[in-house]
Amino acid sequence: MENIQFDSGIRTYRINGEGVLRFNPGDPNVYARFLEAVEKLKAAEEELTRQAETAKETQIVELMTQADRKMKGILDWVFGGDNDFGAILKGVNLLAVADNGERVSTKLFATMEPVLVEGAKRC
């Protein structure tokens, strides 16, 4: 079998010195999914908040775990199937709070947004 190789624009990013994320930052499909994901992730957090209001204290952790799985699935969809955000983030829950008081999901999106905006400008 012969092999055909070309530059597809795929770039590799090391996340927090550990996990590896691969995608084409200049792909308008990735940017469109990223914008859509912002709303989907907000909706997942709002759903968690609603569920937590009536949940027993012992159920809160399970609700957060379910929301984390859902949110990581959204991120896997945004950046492509070869990326596994459970592995990329080394198991950290996206709803965890960073040292500055912001959620990990908020920090991740704030960090990725400029990369995607710059890529979208090249299209």
Predicted segments with their positions:
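Short N-terminal mixed-charge amphipathic segments
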Residues: M1-I60
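Short coil/turn segments at secondary-structure boundaries
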Residues: Q59-Q66, A96-D99
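Non-catalytic, well-ordered alpha-helical scaffold segments
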Residues: A32, D68-G73, T106, A110
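Generic ordered-secondary-structure signal
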Residues: E2, F6, N16, V20-L21, ...
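C-terminal charged interaction modules
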Residues: W77, D82-C123
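Charge-rich, low-complexity alpha-helical coiled-coil segments
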Residues: T54, V61-E62, A120-C123
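Low-complexity, compositionally biased segments
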Residues: I10, G19, D27-V30, M71, ...
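Short, structured surface segments that line ligand/substrate-binding pockets
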Residues: E62-V78
